[in-house]
């Protein structure tokens, strides 16, 4: 009897540094929320959108934490951007805590020619927002703490004004399909769950209501549909390191309510961003972190069996819609022949290998053309 051996080789972004095991995400959206452990939201009656709508279609982490002992907010936002808090353990404004370094994600994106923006709720957009106004606070906006992003605390800096924009502009950018590849979103102090505000006077419900209103705008956009990814997380646990929430919604995610118990931190998020965009070197503790690749759908080959004439049926899952996949076969793991070239509009496809009837051993792999 002929025996099938399946070998999977995932050739993902082979020309880009640090690609890891991640699919080719085109556009990233990040929503940063405030000061709640995951149990405040998971299964809670005040978070009906998260539990009833988001989680059933998402992947999420059950063991995601802020870095050990790192509090309050500002150090965690800095960590998400740079993999370190630069020794900062307070929430002071950039006038005190600004950093003269290019060792952070936005600078790497700039150097690589990769577009990015941060959308901050309650800013005016006429100046770089270096101090608090309305429900906006700088400590929830890591970019204003880096001199190369603000011209060293210059409220009129052109680079800062171009990249740090009022949140309402996101809707128009989504509609016109002109969003950047990396989009960092900070709601105001009511909508992010930091404060209890009227009329709900319930921080968890406020956040859930805001997400219910705003997330659909992202998920119905062309940028999201074209291999986009939305990450929703929190800065820190209130009174603890967590676990806090990390939710991924993406056409490329495992989805369907998948969750894992892998220990991850903000360093994992940063490493994942560096892998997605192929920028280096590793920033701070990202060098030591496990990435979030398990939340994405893995490439896999399986066989439901043979046809009546002895051919092998192959099911390939975890492919990226809209890209070309080459299924190759070998009898010796040295010489590989393409047996199928497939462009799939979904995350899976099936083929039949009629050549398998001629061999005692047959190995398979899938190559993806980026």
For each feature predicted by the language model, list its residue ranges:
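Positively charged n-region of N-terminal signal peptides that target proteins for export
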Residues: 1-5
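Bacterial N-terminal signal peptides
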Residues: 6-15
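N-terminal pro-sequences and low-complexity stem/linker regions of secreted or lumenal proteins
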Residues: 19-300
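Short, threonine-centered small-residue motifs that mark membrane-proximal processing/anchoring sites
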Residues: 17-19, 327
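Sterically constrained small-residue positions within well-ordered secondary structures
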Residues: 10, 21, 71, 176, ...
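Short, composition-biased motifs enriched in small/polar/acidic residues
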Residues: 298-370
């Amino acid at each position: 009897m002929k025996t099938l051996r399946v070998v999977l080789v995932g050739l993902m972004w082979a020309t880009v540094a640090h690609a890891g095991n991640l699919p080719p995400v085109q556009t990233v959206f990040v929503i940063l929320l405030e000061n709640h452990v995951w149990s405040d939201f998971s299964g809670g009656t005040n978070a009906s959108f998260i539990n009833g709508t988001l989680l059933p279609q998402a992947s999420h982490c059950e063991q995601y934490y802020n870095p050990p002992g790192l509090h309050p907010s500002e150090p965690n936002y800095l960590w998400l951007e740079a993999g370190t808090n630069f020794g900062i353990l307070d929430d002071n404004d950039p006038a005190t805590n600004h950093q003269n370094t290019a060792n952070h994600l936005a600078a790497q994106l700039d150097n690589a020619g990769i577009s990015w923006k941060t959308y901050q709720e309650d800013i005016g957009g006429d100046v770089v927002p270096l101090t608090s106004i309305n429900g906006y606070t700088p400590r929830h906006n890591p970019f204003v703490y880096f001199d190369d992003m603000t011209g060293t605390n210059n409220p009129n800096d052109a680079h800062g004004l171009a990249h740090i924009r009022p949140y309402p502009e996101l809707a128009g950018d989504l509609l016109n399909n002109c969003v950047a590849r990396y989009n960092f979103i900070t709601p105001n102090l009511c909508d992010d769950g930091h404060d209890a505000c009227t009329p709900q006077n319930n921080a968890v419900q406020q956040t859930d209501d805001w997400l219910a209103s705003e997330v659909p705008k992202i998920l119905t956009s062309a940028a999201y549909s074209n291999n986009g990814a939305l990450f929703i997380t929190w800065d820190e646990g209130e009174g603890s390191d967590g676990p806090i929430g990390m939710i991924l919604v993406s056409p490329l995610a495992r989805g369907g309510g998948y969750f894992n118990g892998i220990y991850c931190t903000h360093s994992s998020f940063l490493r994942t961003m560096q892998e997605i965009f192929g920028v280096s070197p590793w920033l701070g503790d990202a060098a030591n972190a496990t990435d979030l690749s398990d939340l994405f759908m893995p490439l896999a080959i399986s066989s439901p069996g043979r046809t009546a004439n002895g051919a092998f049926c192959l099911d390939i899952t975890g492919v990226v819609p809209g890209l070309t996949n080459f299924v190759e076969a070998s009898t010796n793991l040295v010489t590989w022949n393409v047996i199928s070239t497939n462009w799939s509009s979904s995350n899976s496809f099936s083929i039949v290998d009629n050549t398998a009837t001629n061999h005692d051993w047959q190995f398979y792999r899938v190559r993806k053309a980026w």
